[in-house]
């Protein structure tokens, strides 16, 4: 439908929108050091998508995939089999980055509420949300100790519009989902 890659060999129905002055770009031009942390399943969300759908590293945006790209568990067929995903590793890396005191802006994405929610396995979704909650708690405590402001938001997460036992691998138009 739209052109996500320049080398697609088929007709495009909708040209991609150009997003100018995205937050990462604005922070960089204002002299704000930044880093983005996520596990493999959501790393594109804190880089490519957050940066307006472009493969670009903006000024003062640190990308160290050896540290800030936390490996997702690839040993399971679906994430209801390991619903914590890598929430603990993401939280640990965010806390490490906060303690370094090098970045005025640190963002992350926790995958379990979305990825586990899509499986339709209610008990697993609870475990995934609990792992995320624990990670947020650790980040909160570290931010408090290091005098950082913590701002929590969400773009979506399938678990909020949950229907147990009904796997859903698409995104709804619901504000909740």
Briefly describe each language-model feature range.
Residues 1-177:
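Feature captures the catalytic ectodomains and active-site-proximal regions of enzymes
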């Amino acid at each position: 439908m739209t052109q996500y890659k320049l080398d697609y060999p088929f007709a495009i129905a909708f040209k991609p929108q150009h997003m100018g002055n995205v937050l990462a770009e604005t922070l960089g031009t204002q002299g704000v050091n930044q880093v983005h942390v996520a596990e493999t399943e959501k790393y594109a969300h804190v880089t490519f998508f957050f940066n307006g759908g472009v493969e670009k590293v903006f000024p003062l945006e640190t990308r160290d995939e050896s540290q800030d790209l936390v490996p997702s568990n690839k040993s399971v067929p679906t994430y209801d089999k390991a619903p914590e995903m890598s929430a603990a590793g993401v939280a640990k890396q965010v806390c490490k980055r906060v303690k370094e005191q090098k970045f005025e802006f640190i963002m992350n994405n926790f995958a379990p509420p979305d990825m586990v929610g899509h499986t339709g396995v209610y008990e697993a979704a609870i475990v995934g949300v609990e792992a995320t909650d624990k990670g947020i708690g650790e980040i909160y405590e570290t931010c408090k100790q290091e005098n950082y402001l913590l701002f929590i938001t969400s773009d979506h997460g399938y678990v909020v519009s949950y229907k147990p036992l009904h796997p859903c691998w698409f995104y709804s138009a619901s504000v909740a989902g």
